[in-house]
Amino acid sequence: FADAASFDAESLAAVESLKTQSLFYPPDPTETSATVGGTVACNASGAHTFRYGPTRPYVHGLTVVLGDGRVLALERGRDVVEQSGEFLLATADGQEAVVRIPEYTWPTTKNSAGYYAAEGMDILDFFVGSEGTLGIVTEIEVRAIPAPEMSCAVVTFWTSEEQAVAFTETLQDGRDMLSVEAIEYVGPKALSMLRNRRTQLGATSGVPGCLPETAHCAIYLDVGTSRDSYADALSKLAGVIEDHGGSPSTCWSAVERDERERLRHFRHALPETVNAHIAEIRKTEPSITKLGTDMAVPGGRLVEAIGIYRSALREAGLDYVIFGHIGDNHLHVNILPRNAAEYRTGWDLYHRFADAVVGMGGSPAAEHGIGKLKTDFLRTLFHDEGVRQMLQIKAAFDPHSRLGKGTLFA
């Protein structure tokens, strides 16, 4: 992104102002209450991660206050790890300590679990995704890039999940040619839940009333391109839809910004519906919470992962919905327990899914981080030695272990 511009950001509202300058912040979190600091803390990924990647590469500079009062002013490209895998860090008493970066292998999939480590990395990359455990970020400089001249939101409908996955794989292979920025999946049970929401709430549901009766599942797309390439990109997309058994005539599409936002809300209405469903159950079972997975698998393993999810959930007799960032091979399985026994079973399945996904080379925490509830998964992914190396990084930046108690590490 040679034309990228730097921008000091204190809030996502400030980032929103970039749109008037034909610029945008590519991580583009889908949660409207997100903050820039929050997105940096967990290396957030929005729907547009498919094309642009997560938060980390768009963080150009950080000012960080460490737990012992030291202040670091870090800049990408200036403060980097030496080829030896080491860097110098000033200590509180004015000395310098040699710090070695971890040697574990970072997943090639989306991943927000643990401290990033890679050869030639920038020191600020430790803080992006560290969940507040290494320092308090007080200032952030992010990169914005030119916004596409033309944008279109499209919802495609499919009569089988197999069609939808095959369509997605074709888009993944031709992402540059087709100018697709986001690919979001709404599975069969999820689409049924949205239909029920429309029936109950009508026009206030955020779900259009013209859902095709034959639709088994849906895929939401964002297309962004130059003005000159726009018509050609949409024509090619229509061809790909037809090639996979879909019908462009049943698709929804929107070009104007307000209409695009309406289609985006169609996808975002789903987690709102799930949360409302769980809230209703909690009236009689207050110990229940939603169990939402956050796992990504390598390319070519998505069908296998979906099969594992569905088979285990069916065998356990649990209710669930599947949706999410299918373009990144990153689907959210939301398990919907009806009582405490099902909740315990759901947690057991959650751990089984994590083991299976890591065995494929994927991540059990693709975008939401580890937090305080999933510390077991950090060890599942990086094993005892990897966690030990992370604790050494933690000790270098936070020697008194004052920050983020219980986060990442049990």
Question: What is each of the regions a protein language model found here?
Answer:
Residues 39-42, 198-199, 336-337, 379-382:
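Short low-complexity, flexible loop/linker segments enriched in glycine and/or proline
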Residues 128-130, 136-347, 352, 356, ...:
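C-terminal substrate-recognition/cap domain of FAD-linked oxidoreductases
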